Amino acid sequence: MLIINDNNLSGLSLQRVNGTGELSVQFKDGRSRISRLYQEGAAKIRMPQAVTGPLEAILINTSGGLTGGDRLKWDVALDDGASAVITTQACERIYRSGGGEARIATRLKAAKGTRLAWLPQETILFNRSILSRRLDVELEEGAQMLVVEATVFGRLAMGERVVAARFADRWRVRLGGRVIHAEEFRLGPDVGAELQATAVAGGACAMATVLMVCEQAGRHLETARAIIGEEGGCSLWRVGKASKLVVRLYAPDSYALRRRLCPLVALLNGKAGLPKVWTI
């Protein structure tokens, strides 16, 4: 007979989420197609059938969310001439940590003549959560890229407020082997107070960064500024033969954020438009 009490449970560790999803896309017979697919653990990738246009991939975390000690890794590579739109089935949720940080690592590679759109839905951080998010991008000359990362601190409509949490967001984007964009954004542990600062978020609880790299990014500058309005900003840089368009958006909640983020993504993503799962 097995007797369970607090003494013999104290040394047990909780099962952790570990997921790895890898996708390679090639252009063959007039279409962008899968050339390699690997899935492990909680990471799953599904591709809705499309006859024309870019390959669309939907990333799924079957665990339903992440907490301290959980790991999720995504790796996407596009061969010459391929195009792909990568999104997620739902918002990623980062729950209260019992110890340690949740980690999400993404690596994107795009060869010459490709077009890659990385468009995950929002990441929602709950009170006392800890998240380390990392994005590494390698672009060859002539590749086009659109990246969106949106973060929400609590769901105000559900009465949730984030007072304490830790969030670290690291970006490295290289074009032709040279770094053209880098970010080291950190908040915490007093997130509730820090978000109130004018230089941080001015009281906003939802934010997004949008990065576009292509030769003609500048043509979207004025339209993007009109969509963004006063709660955010948009700027343009020349990086070699390409241009870099950077957008920052802030809003009081996720609903208000999406009201501007959705038309912005639809604009910048061209004929591919907004991923269908964003509207479900």
UniProtKB/Swiss-Prot annotation:
Disulfide bonds: none annotated. Keywords: Chaperone, Cytoplasm, Nickel insertion. GO terms for molecular function: nickel cation binding. InterPro entries: UreD. GO terms for cellular component: cytoplasm. It comes from the Bacteria. The keyword Cytoplasm applies. Required for maturation of urease via the functional incorporation of the urease nickel metallocenter. Belongs to the UreD family. This is Urease accessory protein UreD 1.
